[in-house]
């Protein structure tokens, strides 16, 4: 719709001299002219920009969507509610008032209709859309276009950047951006906190769709400029979860929702907490970075026995892997064992280095605070000392 009363209007007159217009209660009347599709309203004026197709509107069959189509007053219509994708698919775009021909197939970048997204309409913010060949929008779905996979919000806007998506039965139940008001993930700490505590347990998957004018879904190993730094991610390369961020081990490295868990250059080594629990009848595994050796030994499931108690300077202390040191040469020394403090959650602790490589062999690994993590032949931490 275009509400500018002062603009020039185009009309089409049939061979009998009568103008073409929508009648019999129709919203618009379609006409192919010189191979292009146009639409005319009840007054005969050519439709420009956005139009809601009356026949296609029947796709919006559920009660809430019909209400949104008639009142356009509920915020859910542009907040990612999966019930409204079919309503969006009933919209078509007819270019400018000077042109008016329908975009039948392909990409176009415009400001959304007010009834599709009032906030973006008020801000005069353009977004990318795709018409399916009949002029209808892709909405609430993944689509492969010329060999590349894209995703479209329920209001039709192409997705870009890093997103958490929860799929519904027919469309997207929810899409979260990194600046989400309640559960943001625009820095590493918030990413891990919210991915672990909310997104993964509730069925969301992390995807990356490139920059504002790109939108193509990434797969495999990907470097993203995230929070001002180049950050490594890994997204599924095939199968039903193609494009979803990997949670788990891949090529001897650990990922949470696609983000690589690794020590920074100052820390050298960090411990990752692998937690396994059941949520809504499903097994959920999450991975979280611990701050340092002290944080590791403070975990409820970790028992750190002080080996320097009741020793003298010359006492030989077993620091792991059949190695001994004099007590006077040690500042701290602990024997590490594990228990299960919560019967509903199983914790395992994995040591990783600055490349994210899982330490899975026998050795002594010195972190940035001069703590040594002693690991057995399977990479299990048996001792910590400094």
Over which residues does each language-model region extend?
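Extracellular adhesion/carbohydrate-binding repeat motifs centered on closely spaced tryptophans
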Residues: 1-386
């Amino acid at each position: 719709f275009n509400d500018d009363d002062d603009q020039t209007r185009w009309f089409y007159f049939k061979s009998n001299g009568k103008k073409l217009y929508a009648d019999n209660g129709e919203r618009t009347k379609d006409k192919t002219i010189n191979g292009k599709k146009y639409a005319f309203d009840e007054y005969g004026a050519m439709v420009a920009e956005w139009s809601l197709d009356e026949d296609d509107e029947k796709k919006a069959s559920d009660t809430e969507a019909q209400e949104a189509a008639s009142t356009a007053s509920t915020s859910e219509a542009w907040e990612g509610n999966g019930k409204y994708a079919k309503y969006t698919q009933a919209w078509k775009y007819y270019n400018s008032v000077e042109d008016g021909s329908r975009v039948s197939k392909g990409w176009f970048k415009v400001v959304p209709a007010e009834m599709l997204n009032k906030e973006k309409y008020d801000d005069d913010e353009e977004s990318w859309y795709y018409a399916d060949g009949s002029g209808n929008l892709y909405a609430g779905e993944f689509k492969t276009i010329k060999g590349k996979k894209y995703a479209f919000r329920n209001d039709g806007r192409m997705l870009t950047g890093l997103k958490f998506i929860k799929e519904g039965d027919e469309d997207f139940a929810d899409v979260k951006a990194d600046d989400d008001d309640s559960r943001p993930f625009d820095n590493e700490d918030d990413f891990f906190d919210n991915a672990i505590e909310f997104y993964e347990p509730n069925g969301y998957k992390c995807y990356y769709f490139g920059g504002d004018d790109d939108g193509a879904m990434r797969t495999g190993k990907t470097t993203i400029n995230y929070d001002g730094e180049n950050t490594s991610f890994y997204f599924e390369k095939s199968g039903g979860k193609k494009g979803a961020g990997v949670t788990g081990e891949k090529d001897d490295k650990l990922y949470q929702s696609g983000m690589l868990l690794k020590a920074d250059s100052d820390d050298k080594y960090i411990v990752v907490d692998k937690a396994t629990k059941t949520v809504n009848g499903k097994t959920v595994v999450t991975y979280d970075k611990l701050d340092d050796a002290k944080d590791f030994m403070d975990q409820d499931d970790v028992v750190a026995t002080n080996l320097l108690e009741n020793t003298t300077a010359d006492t030989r202390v077993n620091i792991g892997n059949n190695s001994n040191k004099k007590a006077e040469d040690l500042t701290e020394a602990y024997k590490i064992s594990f228990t299960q403090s919560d019967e509903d959650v199983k914790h395992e602790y994995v040591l990783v280095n600055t490349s994210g490589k899982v330490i899975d062999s026998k050795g002594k690994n010195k972190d940035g605070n001069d703590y040594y993590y002693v690991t057995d032949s399977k990479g299990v931490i048996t001792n910590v000392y400094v």
